[in-house]
Amino acid sequence: EDIEIIYQVFDINEVMLTKIERGHEDYDVVCPSEYIIERMIRKDMLLPINRDFGNTPDYIPNLAPYIQDELNKMSQGDKKVTDYAVAYMWGTAGTLYNTEVVTEEEALECANLWNPKFNNKILMKDSYRDCYGLAIIYANKDRIAKGEVTVEQLMNDNSHESIAKAEEQLKLMKPNIAGWEADFGKEMMTKGKVWMNFTWSGDAVWAIEEAAEVGVELDYVVPIEGSNVWFDGWVIPKYARNVKAASYFINYMCRPDIALRNMDAIGYVSAVATPEILEAKIDSTLENYSDLSYFFGPEADSVQVDPVQYPDKEVIKRCAVIRDFTNKEDLQKVLEMWSRVKGDNLNTGIVLLIFAVFGGLFVWLVISKVNKYRRKMHRKHRRRRR
C-alpha cells in the first residue's frame, strides 16, 4: 500500500523530545541522537520495533556490530537498546582545519585550540555536550596519557569538580573563538575567515568538498587526546499511530542501496556495514590505508577509504560515547555552565563601562522625572494663585 510521508525537521533534539513527552505528539518515527534515545527508553517513551516484515527481507542485521554494541551499552535494565532503536548515521567530533595555515600536527593536538596563535580564528560547534567533552579531555590530557583515566570515564563524569574544570578551560579558550556555530562553519572556513572548526565529521565532509571547488584545501582529524563518537537512530514513540508502517520504513532505510543514497545526499556515514557499502566507498586514489575491521569485519583491515568518514581502528579506540545525564541536577549544572561560558563574552572593563553608562542613564532619567514633577507642581501652584 502507498504511504504518505510527512517530514519535519528539528534543530534541537530536546525540542522534539518535549513535543512527544509533554504534547503527546503522534509522530510515527523520529531520529534522535543516542543520548535522547537513552533518555526515551529510560522514560518508557518508545515501542519495540517489530521485525516481522512478512515477505520483505529484514535489513536491520546489516548494521555494524560495533555500532550495535555501543548502543547496547545504554540499555536500561531488561530493555535492550537495539530492540527499540535502529542506528541511522554515525560519526565523530574533531577539528576541521585549513591546511594552508594549520599543520596536521597542530590540528591533532587539541591543546592548539587554546594556542594564542589562533586568536579569533576558531569556530566551536554550538553543542554543550561536544564542548564539555573536549574541555574535560583537555583538562585531563596528562592523566589520559598516563593511563590513569579513560576518555569514556571523563566525558561521563558530571561531578561538580569536572564541570568547574570544563568551564575554566572553555573560558580560557574564548579569545580564540570567533563564534559558536550550528550551520555556518563551512562557509567561514571556505572563505578563510577562520582556520579551525571543532565540528562533526559529516559537516567536515561537506566543507572539504565545497572548499575544494573554490581552491581551498581543508582537512579533518580527531584529536590525539580523544573525542566523542555519536549515533543517530530511528525509534518509534509510544504515541505513534502507524506502528507497522514505521517498522517497515526503518527496515527500508537499512537496505544497502538506500543507505548509500542517503550518504550521498547528506554527507554523513550510514550505520549499515555490508560489502556493497565498503565496495562503494573504496577510493584507490587515496595514499593511506585504514583498518576498518571494527566496522566492516576482518576483510577490511587495510582499505583505501576516506578517513574523515570512516576513522581508523586506532582513532576509534580513543573515542567514546557521551551518555545522557541521568540526573536532572547534573544536567542543569552543565547547562548553567554552558550559559555562563557563552554569555561571558565581555571583559571587566567593558562590563564596568556598560554599568557606568546604564547607571548614568538611570540617574538622568530619575533627575528628569523629578524636574518634570517639580515643573508640573509649580504650574499647578501658579494656577491656584490666579
Predicted feature residues:
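Tryptophan-centric aromatic hotspots in well-structured domains and transmembrane helices
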Residues: 10, 35, 88-90, 110-114, ...
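Loop/turn elements at helix/coil->beta-strand transitions in domains of secreted/extracellular proteins
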Residues: 2-4, 25-28, 118-122, 175-176, ...
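Solvent-exposed, polar/charged alpha-helical surfaces in well-ordered, non-transmembrane soluble domains
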Residues: 14-18, 38, 111, 164, ...
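Mature extracytoplasmic/periplasmic domains
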Residues: 237-316
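Extracytoplasmic/periplasmic substrate-binding proteins
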Residues: 175-239
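Extracytoplasmic ligand-binding site segments that recognize negatively charged/polar headgroups
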Residues: 33-193, 207
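Conserved C-terminal helix/tail region of periplasmic/extracytoplasmic solute-binding proteins
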Residues: 302-386
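Early extracytoplasmic/lumenal segment of secretory-pathway proteins
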Residues: 1-43, 346-349
